[in-house]
Amino acid sequence: MPKASEVKKNAAIEHNDKVYVVKDINKLTPSGRAGASLYRMRLYEVTTGAKADESFKADEMIKTADFVRQPVTFSYIDGDEYVFMNSEDYTPYNINKETIEEELLFIAEDTTGLQVMIVNGSAVGIELPPNVELVITETDPSIKGASASARTKPATLSTGLTVQVPEYISSGERIKISTSEHKFVSRADK
């Protein structure tokens, strides 16, 4: 069993006899010298999707839930459900839009490296690859000779995500985005 300080985002844990997926973690450090760090976690219950905020001491042991990851590709939208297809055996997995709201900003039709997280036979979330490639739909015109400049400008991507990009990048270009930092990494390989 890992300590609370070792739990990562998107981990499946058991707490109060229920299985949760950790969506966000904030480390709180008390101002007193003897105070131990606290980890405040935003949890989503697997079966109902109910949100819960829980605090754990840094050295508190947390039981991880058994879950499986399967490689998937985005297939289509069915009402409020997003359907992902298993890349190996073509099993469809329906996931509610609210459950993967943050991840949707990085998922386009051709996004590769996605994995569905399955707990007790049901899909509970999507795990993103470290970087994804997306197309810029709108940004200010590029400035010739600006490659030496470190200045940036906002760019809206095909999924609606807005990131800062270097001035020499223009609309229609395909770029790599870090999914953990929400930042521009580089131009995509052609």
Swiss-Prot record:
One of its GO terms (biological process) is peptide biosynthetic process. One of its GO terms (molecular function) is translation elongation factor activity. Pfam families: EFP, EFP_N, Elong-fact-P_C. SMART domains: EFP, Elong-fact-P_C. It comes from the Bacteria. InterPro entries: Elong-fact-P_C (IPR015365), NA-bd_OB-fold (IPR012340), Rib_uL2_dom2 (IPR014722), Transl_elong_fac_P/YeiP (IPR020599), Transl_elong_KOW-like (IPR013185), Transl_elong_p-like_YeiP (IPR011897), Transl_elong_P/YeiP_cen (IPR001059), Transl_elong_P/YeiP_CS (IPR013852). One of its GO terms (cellular component) is cytoplasm. Belongs to the elongation factor P family. PANTHER family: ELONGATION FACTOR P (PTHR30053), TRANSLATION ELONGATION FACTOR KOW-LIKE DOMAIN-CONTAINING PROTEIN (PTHR30053:SF14). This is Elongation factor P-like protein. It comes from Pseudoalteromonas atlantica (strain T6c / ATCC BAA-1087).
